[in-house]
Structures are given as structure tokens and as C-alpha cells.
Amino acid sequence: IVSYNEKVLQDIGKNKTLTVMLAGRPYHSDPLIQHKISDMISEMGVHVITDDLVRDKEVGIDDIHFVAQWAYTNRILKAAKWCATQGKEIQFIEMTSFGCGPDAFLVDEVREVLMRHNKSLTLLKLDDISNIGSMKLRVRSMIESLKLIDEHPAETPDIKDFVTVPIYDQTYRNRKILVPFFTPFMSPLIPSILKVAGYDVENLPLSNSESCEWGLKYANNEVCYPATLIVGDIIKAFKSKKYDPAKTAVAITQTGGQCRASNYISLIKKALIDAGYTDVPVISISFGGGIENNQPGFSVSWLKILPVAFYSILYSDCIAKFYYGSVVREKEKGISARLRDQYLELADRLADRKRRRSGSSDFIKLLHAEFCQSQGQCRGTCGEQAAIGSGSEWGIQDSKKADKQDQCDSSPIPLFRSVR
């Protein structure tokens, strides 16, 4: 396939006739899946080559935000970069079947690469087409417009430089770091965990409709919904004027594997650039070794932070189980949420003091007792468990031993097992 593409390229090189490079997923080579687009273009008098041409070529794709994790996406990016550096007689068409997935990140990157070299992207969404005639009309319109450009040549504009956010080095070390809101059980503990590592971290508020609006404006509209919210939360924070871009950085977790979430960082960088916040570095927080984000100023001693993080995760998981088990049975509306927030706020002291198992187990006994009392599902042991752990140490009033009859209900089985 590569040799055939090379031969076609040599044949058209002498006359510089109009040529279209077709790029897409491997299954788009099937004529039925691609609706015979290649035949359609050939019948219009235009040569067709495929992205297989660049398989053996050394084409650098360092000037992109995309995290290159998949073979076919890397090939499409290389093909777009190669096409962008060729003459105007070689143009680019990308085929996609659905936007959600890597394609949502990829399309924007391909468009940026071509636009920097003063070329445009023609994107054909094959699964959105119910009438082949409309696609044929669009392809013909593209080809005719390119022929008009050849007939009326104009001065070629300069190639634009690749613009990205700054590298997080020691000059940015003292900046406040904003992190998206992940979960009401773990997010409140994140600032304290990273404070142990020496970083000033602040959670962004929970997403709302305004987050959606900003996310749709600065992220691909077919990207997965959480990505839209995360991008929207970050842009909304800066648009609110609450944070100074010159004194702030942004952090996002990455899975380190072949997951769309690993590319959230590329979406955030691109959104910050498009919104005009070019001085805000973006930090990747990941345990995976396959993620490369140049950030020499961000260094964490995981041996120091992991014990605190580990017990914080277990603690937040216990609160989540207690909360979801209690909220539908609570005697007083809203008490489960208040207890959740109270014990998450108090847990910050565990991280500040670097308390581990002993402190977290005491807390779990206390919150177990209070959650049980909030719904009357206890056999008279709640008061005893609450007394264990000396709540006054954490600034909590010791739970009083309530009357056994008041603490119990008619159910023979407590909602939660006793914490040992």
C-alpha cells in the first residue's frame, strides 16, 4: 500500500495536479463503510492517496497538544503534518464515523496543524450521512473551490508558530493550583493531601449550567460530557475574575493508559490558549510512567504522600457508604449531608498532622455512630463506639450515650456492621 501511494505521488509530482489525501480509521478503507468516497473523488478528476503513505516516513508531531497513544491517531496526525508541509496541490480529507472517543480530540488537532500551514480540513462524518448525494455535493464543492484557488493564485501567508501553555518550572512553583471538582467525598481532601507535598491547591466548585456553556465554547462538542464540564469549570473560574492567571496554575489527573481521560490535559491546554490565558501552566498528576508532560517544577515524594493519600481514599470511601446508606433513611432531612461535610472538613486535620491509621479509624468509629443515630438504626452500641476515639481531640463534642430505646428501631439488623 505504501509503495502504491509512493508511485501515485511520483506520477503527480511532475504536473502538480490536484491530489487529496484520505485519512481515517483502518476500517474506513472498506469501500462500503466509506460510501466509495475514493471512487467519487477519482471520478471528479482528482488523484487520491491514503494516510498509509506516511507509515515509514519520519514526520515529527511534537508541535501538538494531543497525547499520542493510539497507532491510527498517530498515523493521521503524521499524515496531516506531512500534507500541511506540501504544496497547495495536496489537500486533506479526514473520515470519521463518530465523534465520541479519540476522534473528538484528534479532529481539533488535525485542524490546528493544517490551519497553521494555511490549509483547511474537510471532515466527513460518515455515520451522519443519510443521503450520499449531499456528501457528493460537499466533496465536489471543495474540489471546485480548490481549482479556483489554482486559477487565481494569491500570496501565501506565513506559517504560524505553534502556541502552547508555559512549562511548569521552578518560576511557577509558588502559584496556586486549581483542580476540578471530582467527587463530594474525595475532592474536599485533595488540598490537604497535596499540602503535605508543599503545594497550595484549591478545588473548583461543582459544575453547573454555566460550566456547560463555557465547555461547549472551548472544547469539541462531541467530546465526552465530563471533559466538557472540566474544561468549562476551568474557563469559568478565570472568566469570573476570581483568579489571576498570572498567579495560577491548573492540574488534572491522567490515567497513564490508553484512555480518553489521558487526553483531558490536551483539551485544557487548547482551551486556555483559545480563551487567551497563555500564561497558565497545566500540571499532570499521574502514577503512570507513559505520560510525558514537561513539568520540572512539579515534584512529589510519593513515599511521603502515599500513606496520607491511601488512608484518605479509604476514609472518603467509608463516608460515601455511610452517606448513601443513610440519606434515604434519615429521620431529619439533610442531616446525612451535614454529617458528611462535617467529617470531611475535620479530616483535613488528619492530613495536616500526617495522622494515618489511628486517626482515621477513630474518625470512622465516630461517624459510624452519628450516622446510625441519624436514622435510629442502632442496638445501643452507638454511644459506646462514639466514646472510643476521644472526639474532643479533633474539636468534636463527644457523643452522649443516648437511651437504648431512642437509639434503636424495630429492625432486628443494624444498617451497618460495627467497626472493629
Report each predicted region and the residues it spans.
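An N-terminal assembly and electron-transfer interface module characteristic of large anaerobic redox
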Residues: 1-420
